Amino acid sequence: MNFIKSVLFVAVLILIFPLLPLVAGEQEQDINIIEEKVPVSNEIIDEESAKPQPESEEEEMVFPRSMTFLDVSEITPVDIKESPADDSKSIGIVYGKLMHVDVIQNLENGYSEISTWDYRSMRDIRGFVPTKLLKTVELNKKYGIVVALSQQKVYIYEDNALIKTFLCSSGLDDNNYFTPKGLYRIGERGESFFSPKYGQGAYYWVRFNNNYLFHSVPFDENRNIIEEEAAKLGQKASHGCIRLAIEDALWLYNNIPQGTPVIIKD
């Protein structure tokens, strides 16, 4: 009986043994197919760079077509009156030609109520000026400038499209040296200036509101660039003006015409 069981066991082994390589081969083939579907790569994928990057909000800009200002010279102050009368006290001053003022109402007595900011105190004020001093003009349509204080950058536009970006230094936040926000227009210019008060000067100045200028990084009394001040581009550092690298100040000086709108914002 035991002999018969042994013979049957050997017979079964003989029948199934040739099938073992076939089973193993199919399993190996399946593994190879899976490996081909998921190739191994040594390339590291930067998930952030793979995401679509948003376009700069500054790539296009629509500028105002006109602005209203006080029609006196760029360096002449106008008193803003507390009430619409010649003998009313002054509550502030505004310089002419380059700074936008908002007209609230025109009165019958020859005065107009305006909203603006006081050049001395840097505070927003609301008062009265002679209506005859108000003038509205069209702004230059070819170029436009935006100063972004939070970014410390100057954006130059041609036909509302961004063409240049300059790193800048605007006014410090303390001691009333900050650069005031608002709408201005480009005025007169000069090759250089020197301020004995601050012991500094600069090249290629372009006015946008009385003593507020675009100009190069400052130089000392010997007309040498002050390197520690030049190194501050990209952060607030000036007495209110907009400092630029020398080559950028020169480009603006040579290319941006009078009457070009300037928007200074956060």
Protein language model annotation of sequence segments:
Residues 30-52, 93-131:
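SH3/SH3-like beta-barrel superfamily modules
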Residues 2-26:
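Sec-dependent N-terminal signal peptides of Gram-positive bacterial secreted proteins and lipoproteins
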Residues 19-80, 129-130:
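N-terminal, intrinsically disordered, polar/charged segments of Gram-positive cell-envelope systems
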Residues 131-225:
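Gly/Pro-biased beta-strand-loop elements
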Residues 76-85, 239-246:
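Short, structured beta-strand/loop micro-motifs enriched in basic residues and often containing a Trp
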Residues 61-63, 67-68, 84, 132-143:
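Intrinsically disordered, low-complexity Ser/Thr-rich linker and spacer segments
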Residues 25-40, 53, 140, 181, ...:
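Exported/periplasmic cell-wall-interacting domains
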Residues 82-96:
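SH3/SH3-like (including bacterial SH3b) beta-barrel domains
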